[in-house]
Amino acid sequence: LRLANMPDTLRLVAKYHEHQEKVMKKTHLLIIDPQNDFCDIAGAALPVAGANADMQRLAAFVDAHAARLDDIHVTLDSHNPVDIAHASWWVDSLGNPPVPFTVISQDDVIAGKWRARHPDAQARSAAYVRQLSQAGRYALLIWPEHCLIGSWGHNIQVDLMGALNRWARSRMEIVDYVTKGSNPFTEHYSAVKAEVPDAADPSTLVNTRFIDTLARADQILIAGEALSHCVANTVRDIAANFGDDNVRKLVLLGDCSSSVAGFESLGADFVTEMTARGMRVMKSTDY
């Protein structure tokens, strides 16, 4: 190759790389709360029917498409025993705690039906349920203690954990783990922000690093538990921060996510809402 031809050669190389960047789309996999406590297996605190099979299908998907997955993000529900959505936080007029799946409304707190067990937390707890109501968020629901930090229930489902580690080793990449839920004064369904953000706690505010990382992807595959709650809220918040033009990047792997029993309509409403905005839904086996 003569030196005189070098500028033309460099231009051709630059055009080739520009073309490759356009052709080689970045694909990210977002896995929401794939933890033992949400799987329908022995010992789970809050089992979601079908979740274990969801995670097994997802593990097979990761193994089958490892070379096509440029980044994997895994959110982890991470709670303390003492939490505003746990029974130990509240008592009735007789001093009894609520049973799991009790709904505590603003009117209930005003009427004295429920109060914070610790007197110092009463004003903030009352303000919390009021803010939920004003913002049109889910009503406060008392959940069984789940995904306690450091517990077996907090761990990732075993088949998926193996697949994630195989992906990391084969690609020489690090799985991006995103924790949420350790602030006891607010629920944190969404991995993007808490139900009622706490200005004094950055972990409850919009996770701009997470959003910015996802924004660099051309396609974001979504899976995890539960479709009705943490998946729905996370994806809605991602879409709100992306803008409508980028919602088309989102692809829900419909056979890798299930709703909490009794809340199936929330999951269905979420899918209807987001597909109308451009999100696609497909089976992991059709990818």
Features from the language model and the residues they span:
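Gly/Ser/Thr-rich loops at beta-strand to alpha-helix junctions
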Residues: H79-P81, E225-V231
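Short Gly/Pro-enriched loop/turn and capping motifs at secondary-structure junctions
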Residues: I220, A226-H229, C256-V260
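Active-site acidic carboxylates
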Residues: Y16-V178, A215-R216, R236, A240, ...
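Surface-exposed cleft-lining segments at the edges of enzyme active sites
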Residues: G43-G50, L141-S151, N183-S203, A217-E225
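Short beta->alpha linker loops
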Residues: S182, A226, T285-Y287
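Histidine/lysine/aspartate-rich catalytic loop segments that bind and position anionic ligands
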Residues: G162-L214
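Short, positively charged and aromatic/hydrophobic N-terminal segments
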Residues: N5, T9-R11, K15-Y16, Q20
